[in-house]
Amino acid sequence: KQDANRALANELSVFCEITNTDYFKILKLLELDDPSFWPTIVEEENRNESYLLLDSAENLNAKLKLPALARQINENMVKHAVNLTQDSLRSAGKPLRRAKIAVLGTANPASATGIFVKIIEQKGAKPSLYDPISKMGPQEWRVVKTSLNEAVEGTDCIVILTGQEQFKNLNLKKLKALMKTPAVIVDLIGIFEPPKVEAEGFIYCGLGRGTDKN
């Protein structure tokens, strides 16, 4: 059920981007401003549960079409995140190739964050990764940085993939001073209001965030 709900939220958020509307504003208007309705790239718990269900069904020679479709939609969101990142860099006049990107997410190569990092590396980007709750260091995974400032310094773009408390309270002014300009923020979990980010001089791009300007 959670995976299907998340798939619907993800599909609607992508639709809002296409139609140039703000998915999060719509949620507030409908009084549905609850995390269970938010789109996301990272949902490891749902993924594990879904594959357990699908594997069990397969062992019984049963086909579960809706759970399989929901899982496919959610898996494809990582590729959508890459496309959003590429588009936001392009709007700043920068190619994804050779761009330095600070990824704020989960320090686990097998996670959605890890898959995202792998894809942008294959496309020529130079990622750094910061996870405030992980004990993993660069000796285990070379892209990992031990501090937020180290991960962000000299980058073109910050991509926020997970909602750790530290990420919700970022000092945007200080971070921008560490970055190359024009600086880009790609918010994939909806923790920032676009005007707040843009007021600090960033180019903002977010999952489900059409500009809502016609």
Predicted regions and their residues:
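Structural/interface elements that position substrates and couple domains in central-metabolism enzymes
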Residues: 1-214
